[in-house]
From Swiss-Prot:
Bridged cysteine pairs (disulfide): 55-120, 163-211, 264-311, 355-404
Reported tissue expression: Expressed in skeletal muscle, heart and brain. Brain expression is hippocampus-specific.
Residues modified to Phosphothreonine: 994
Domain Fibronectin type-III: 430-524, 526-622, 631-742, 751-844, 849-944
Residues that span the membrane, as ranges: 957-977
Membrane topology (UniProt): Single-pass type I membrane protein
Highest rank taxon of the organism: Eukaryota
Gene giving rise to this polypeptide: Igdcc4
UniProt keyword annotation of Glycoprotein present: yes
Protein name: Immunoglobulin superfamily DCC subclass member 4
Amino acid sequence: MARADTGRGLLVLTFCLLSARGELPLPQETTVKLSCDEGPLQVILGPEQAVVLDCTLGATAAGPPTRVTWSKDGDTVLEHENLHLLPNGSLWLSSPLEQEDSDDEEALRIWKVTEGSYSCLAHSPLGVVASQVAVVKLATLEDFSLHPESQIVEENGTARFECHTKGLPAPIITWEKDQVTVPEESRLITLPNGVLQILDVQDSDAGSYRCVATNSARQRFSQEASLTVALRGSLEATRGQDVVIVAAPENTTVVSGQSVVMECVASADPTPFVSWVRQDGKPISTDVIVLGRTNLLIASAQPRHSGVYVCRANKPRTRDFATAAAELRVLAAPAISQAPEALSRTRASTARFVCRASGEPRPALHWLHDGIPLRPNGRVKVQGGGGSLVITQIGLQDAGYYQCVAENSAGTACAAAPLAVVVREGLPSAPTRVTATPLSSSSVLVAWERPELHSEQIIGFSLHYQKARGVDNVEYQFAVNNDTTELQVRDLEPNTDYEFYVVAYSQLGASRTSSPALVHTLDDVPSAAPQLTLSSPNPSDIRVAWLPLPSSLSNGQVLKYKIEYGLGKEDQVFSTEVPGNETQLTLNSLQPNKVYRVRISAGTGAGYGVPSQWMQHRTPGVHNQSHVPFAPAELKVRAKMESLVVSWQPPPHPTQISGYKLYWREVGTEEEADGDRPPGGRGDQAWDVGPVRLKKKVKQYELTQLVPGRLYEVKLVAFNKHEDGYAAVWKGKTEKAPTPDLPIQRGPPLPPAHVHAESNSSTSIWLRWKKPDFTTVKIVNYTVRFGPWGLRNASLVTYYTSSGEDILIGGLKPFTKYEFAVQSHGVDMDGPFGSVVERSTLPDRPSTPPSDLRLSPLTPSTVRLHWCPPTEPNGEIVEYLILYSNNHTQPEHQWTLLTTEGNIFSAEVHGLESDTRYFFKMGARTEVGPGPFSRLQDVITLQKTFSDSLDVHAVTGIIVGVCLGLLCLLACMCAGLRRSSHREALPGLSSSGTPGNPALYTRARLGPPSVPAAHELESLVHPRPQDWSPPPSDVEDKAEVHSLMGGSVSDCRGHSKRKISWAQAGGPNWAGSWAGCELPQGSGPRPALTRALLPPAGTGQTLLLQALVYDAIKSNGRKKPSPACRNQVEAEVIVHSDFGASKGCPDLHLQDLEPEEPLTAETLPSTSGAVDLSQGADWLGRELGGCQPTTSGPERLTCLPEAASASCSCSDLQPSTAIEEAPGKSCQPKALCPLTVSPSLPRAPVSSAQVP
């Protein structure tokens, strides 16, 4: 039941909306009253219907009209079979019996003469009032312009059918399924714009659908379209589909009170959520309802509903979304907010009517006097944008009704007010016998006779004059004393018609105006010379062409022209005269390749005016004429105030030219005075601007941004593939700017003010402006010029016309700066473009993938990528996306995704399998979202070599052998010490480090005391690129093992350094592990170690070696110490997994391990800071457990933070850490994430002994 009520409610709502628009068919006969009110009225006549138009202007006219006249489309109404004038002044109209598409010619004629715009004039004693317009249309219904289309929709999806047709009145759209009206269900949504939406599609919805349009004229059926329902998930196109807006809202303009539907249908898998917001952030009005699930319905649109509405569709459980925006513009018909008031004025006084109107867009105002449009003249002025009407020197002819009519695109409104002219008794009559006699081209003598009645009461006269022709003429007046009846008027324009009249004044008031006197001022010599154009059709001729002078410069009728010419450097000048109706002359029998000077002057009946400036031209040479084009013919230039319009005709043999070159320059004051600068025949002088290259088909070009009243020279040459041709030259002045002190004609409108551009989307920009703050003309529309910023190609500039004060410009490129300029247009005149406003469109997803993707294998597990940015990024690239897989048939979400920053253009992908084919594709992402991926590219990784395939067991064997050799070496050293009992221990050495205790030592060759020793055990932490250094030389590639009193430990720093030392039995328990330590710097002998103990560089097994050495030492330490070996035995093992990673200790020395002579007490320095390892782990834990600085100076011990054993994640390389930017390329290198060290492998502690 609720569903049925919803369907009926929509039909009732549609009926009410049509009633509000005045588009419902009328009953059999209806009366429509026409008055001075809002309009126009729209009357639609259906079949067999009639209407009576009643001219009800009695209230306005202060009584019933004495006479009513009707007009149709501005002409007098003629009666016919379907139109009759009734005795009461009303008009009866009926619709013809035949339809519009009938074959009866008579019916078609009656149909055409019936439709039109009807208005009436009501005549009364006070004046005439014009009614509003009634537009009469006959009901029609056109064929469908859009038929529904068949479609396949999955279950629970959304189906949408659409049809379009036009008719009067607007047809009601219904839908049928299998030729039966669709049931009234909430799932079936019928929109007024001819759309049927079927939500949650079911199997029962399958069938044939058609659209039915019905109005008072007829009923029409559309073509049928089938709906096929498929199983959910069976359509591959919709499986996992991203969110897409299937039906987006459209920009809509409606009149206030009409309904509007903002439709939005989205599709995705799963079904998306749809929401609406206003772009300006304001809340959506509460009277806006949701029709169906995703559509907005505004039943009665008001100006407050205007704005941009954004539909957003979100895919559930994802961040994918799509948006669509549309502007709703609600127009408001004009309404008179301040009507003019009735006035009563005495003769010769001033009347002022004020009218104000509101509406959207802002209405334009014009005035009627007794039903006739009022044209401003000298006495009647329209001010304030049409809102004020001022009438001076009121006469009886000015009495009547004045109507203020406001008009915009939504309708009209009017208000009327009468003007009564009061004539007092005893006023003088009008002056008589007014005459105007021309004295010269600029002066007229006006005379009159005194009035016949009450002449003795006259205290003075007023003389009024204005131009007799043209519109918007300014009226001038002079006050004249009573003692004279004539006046000489000066400063008139030559060859111009003027109208004069006189008014007499007494103490009681003014008389009527006298009869006008017309006069034509005398001719004068022309105030300027025609502007010349010179060209040579052959070597011995010069064609001279000019344009006729305008009437403002000719000062009369031009009767003749005089052309003077001669060689450039000779005094002899020839002249010839031609009639005034000629505009060109050919000078014959001239010398080839010579410079001639030419000038022209125009003559009227008063004589010749000033001649033009000398203009020089070189005739072509007689040789090599086959390749040199002649000058263009008939070069004409029409001068404007700030531009020159250049037009021409092709030269002889136009097929031989490739185009034209146009030059122009401003002639300086000195040049203008002497005019002796030779122009040259083929471009041998410098020009301010040019050349502008034009195609051969172009025959007109306008030079803009010129200075008014300046002398310019223009040169046009034709060129071909060989060279430039001969020039056609013109010299003349632009029009002068109007002088503010003199009476001027109304100038062009000013550019709009407050031009503002606002980005609307990635492809559209809103441009808004306001009417000029001051203008003397009525602005009818505007032109918007726009193009990409900094554009030099004029063919890419676009122009739009707008009647309002804003426009939405679409079809733009994303993330592109555009420049805009707006121009105002008056009636028959165009204003200049205003200042340029710049604005960029919003960014969007990239339209193209990264370009020039190149792949190259580096190692069996590494591939390097190089690419270039997308050709159409549509914004700033913030991230590049790399997808790769060894199986290109896998779904895209199963590929490995790597990301890198937007300013990097190369990368390395690690962790790949050797000798495997990988497929790569790349995409780019802006802040809006990702763009498309590139096409697939494949690469095969390298095969593993022998060194690459060396297994861990072989490496382990090598390391075990090295360790065993090291243990044997130490055992031999201990045995040798026991057999050397005859040697005496050095005083001052003991296990406790106190002087006087005996000690044993091996002979060792002391190294340079000034070079520090560096002994490191590298961890698996990858060296940072900035810590890289080249491998040491052979001399530096050695380590030393010193005697019992080991040398100092170097101050090598780095997070990857590890150090190990051990002593005889009773060695300490190893305590903890450290990321690295900074040990005291010292000097002294270094322990030596043979190179055989060093593992191969780059084996990557340092951590395993560390564990093996540690286990061997630990097992040796379990033996019970011998009393004979109580002295400290110390050695350091140096193992580098990569010598190139050692940066702090580049000067390592490797010395042979052979017996040396024992050191004496005198040669061996006393120890300082030597540690007895027999004290066990307690001492070591006490000294190193905190890893905090305990001393200062040379014996400090500083540990770096224990960070190597902690896990590390590189968030900037998520979701995979297998990528490293290649150093040395455009990518900036990044430090790789250090690998985690297993806690099950112990780390060797560090012992320190220093000999100061």
